[in-house]
Amino acid sequence: MPSLAAIRQERREARLTLLRQGAAAVVASHPNGEVWLFGSLARGDWDAYSDVDLLAIAPDKAKADALADALLDAHLGDDVLALTLERWQRLLGTDEPYWREIRREAIRLDPP
């Protein structure tokens, strides 16, 4: 009988696979877009009530907003933050605790 940790890991991997497939499909119609998962599911400490936190990154604000809307319409994320690529790159270098945590835990879902 598998351990609880093994079952949780298996369920997490299955969920990540579905998110990766969905993100790839959405990004296919949003060129140069990126989708990153952060939060409890990315860290692995999620539970049945955890939401799915995503970053929608694109070259400009209008494209980032459109990507975020598409992710929400596809029911891939509960909270989706739209960022320009320039802002994302700037935030990667910040020492703000919120963004430092995201930088450490984020998982890219779409194929690079």
Model-predicted regions and their roles:
Residues 38-40:
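Glycine-rich beta-strand-to-loop/alpha-helix junction loops that act as flexible
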Residues 1-34, 43-49, 58-112:
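Catalytic core of pol beta-like nucleotidyltransferases
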